[in-house]
C-alpha cells in the first residue's frame, strides 16, 4: 500500500483559494512567477491563472547558457496557452557581472546557487514594481530534502504546491491540462549542462516521495522504511541526513535570546 495518497477533488480549489487569499490579504494586484518550462512552474502558472485570471499573472522566463532548449520552448508554450504576459530575461550577463566582482574563483556549488539567486532578484524587482507577490514553485519533496537554494528559488512570498509531493504535482498537472511532454520529461534545474534532479539526488522521485512520506509523515524508523521499500538502510540514512541537514532552509534566521540578560542588568 502506497504511503503518498492520490489527490482528492478538493485540492485544486483549496490551492486556488489560497492564492486568492494571499493576494487579497497583501493588497497586491497579482503574482509574478518564474517559468522554467518544468512541471512545477507550469502547474503553479495554471493554478494562478485559474485563481486570478491571466491578466494578473506575469511569467518571467530566465534562461542561462545551461538551460535546455526544450525547457525554454515549454516555458513559452505555457505562457502562450494560458494567455499570460511573459518576459524573457537572459541571466548570463548578471552572473558574469557578479562573478567578475569577486576576487576569488567560485566553486561549482557557488556558481550553481548564484543562478536561482539572480532569478529571485529579478522576480522581486518586477513584483515590487508592479505591486505583486512572488509565487514560488517548490514542491514538498524538494522542501523536505532542501533541494532548493536558500534565498534563491526558496525566496518567495507563497508556495502553492509546497504541500504536494513531486508525483502528486504531476498528477495535478495532468488534471489542469499541462502539456504531457512537460509532465513526462526528466526534471532538471538546468544548473549545468546535462544536469537532472534524479541523478543529482541519487534516486527516482517516485521512490523519494514514498521514502519521505514514511520517514517524515508517518515517522517510521529508518530500518522499517528500508524494509518496506526494499532499500539498504544506508540509502534511507542518506536521505534522512539530507532532511535533517536542510531544516535551517525552512526556518527564519536565528536570533540569540538576550532578553533575560537585558532584564538582569536593571
From Swiss-Prot:
Subunit record text: Homodimer.
RNA-binding keyword on record: no
Record-annotated disulphide pairs: none
Similarity comment text for this entry: Belongs to the NAD synthetase family.
Enzyme Commission no: 6.3.1.5
Any Gene Ontology biological process: NAD biosynthetic process
Gene name in the database record: nadE
GO molecular function (one): metal ion binding
Catalytic activity: deamido-NAD(+) + NH4(+) + ATP = AMP + diphosphate + NAD(+) + H(+)
Key words, A-Z: ATP-binding, Ligase, Magnesium, Metal-binding, NAD, Nucleotide-binding
Functional description taken from the UniProt entry: Catalyzes the ATP-dependent amidation of deamido-NAD to form NAD. Uses ammonia as a nitrogen source.
Any one GO CC term of the record: cytoplasm
Residues bound to Mg(2+): 40, 142
Pathway terms, separated by semicolons: Cofactor biosynthesis; NAD(+) biosynthesis; NAD(+) from deamido-NAD(+) (ammonia route): step 1/1
Annotated ATP binding sites: 34-41, 137, 166, 188
Protein's name according to its UniProt entry: NH(3)-dependent NAD(+) synthetase
CDD domains: NAD_synthase
Binding site for deamido-NAD(+): 117, 150, 157, 248-249
UniProt organism field: Methanothermobacter thermautotrophicus (strain ATCC 29096 / DSM 1053 / JCM 10044 / NBRC 100330 / Delta H)
UniProt keyword annotation of Nucleotide-binding present: yes
Amino acid at each position: 500500500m502506497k504511503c503518498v495518497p492520490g489527490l482528492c477533488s478538493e485540492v485544486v480549489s483549496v490551492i486556488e483559494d489560497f492564492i486568492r487569499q494571499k493576494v487579497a490579504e497583501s493588497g497586491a494586484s497579482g503574482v509574478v512567477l518564474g517559468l522554467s518550462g518544468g512541471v512545477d512552474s507550469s502547474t503553479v502558472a495554471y493554478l494562478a491563472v485559474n485563481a486570478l485570471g491571466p491578466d494578473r499573472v506575469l511569467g518571467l522566463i530566465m534562461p542561462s547558457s545551461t538551460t535546455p532548449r526544450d525547457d525554454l520552448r515549454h516555458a513559452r508554450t505555457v505562457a502562450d496557452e494560458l494567455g499570460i504576459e511573459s518576459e524573457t530575461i537572459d541571466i548570463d550577463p548578471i552572473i558574469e557581472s557578479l562573478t567578475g566582482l569577486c576576487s576569488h574563483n567560485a566553486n561549482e556549488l557557488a556558481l550553481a546557487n548564484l543562478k536561482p539567486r539572480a532569478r529571485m532578484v529579478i522576480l522581486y524587482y518586477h513584483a515590487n514594481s508592479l505591486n505583486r507577490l512572488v509565487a514560488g514553485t517548490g514542491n514538498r519533496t524538494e522542501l523536505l530534502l532542501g533541494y532548493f537554494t536558500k534565498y534563491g528559488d526558496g525566496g518567495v512570498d507563497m508556495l502553492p504546491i509546497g504541500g504536494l509531493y513531486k508525483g502528486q504535482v504531476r498528477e495535478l498537472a495532468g488534471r489542469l491540462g499541462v502539456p504531457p511532454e512537460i509532465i513526462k520529461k526528466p526534471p532538471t534545474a538546468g544548473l549545468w549542462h546535462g544536469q537532472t534532479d534524479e541523478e543529482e539526488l541519487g534516486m527516482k522521485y517516485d521512490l523519494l516521495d514514498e521514502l519521505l512520506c514514511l520517514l517524515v509523515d508517518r515517522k517510521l524508523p529508518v530500518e522499517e522504511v528500508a524494509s518496506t521499500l526494499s532499500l539498504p538502510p544506508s540509502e534511507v540514512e542518506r536521505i534522512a541526513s539530507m532532511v535533517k541537514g536542510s531544516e535551517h532552509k525552512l526556518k527564519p534566521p536565528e536570533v540569540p535570546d538576550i532578553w533575560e540578560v537585558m532584564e538582569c542588568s536593571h
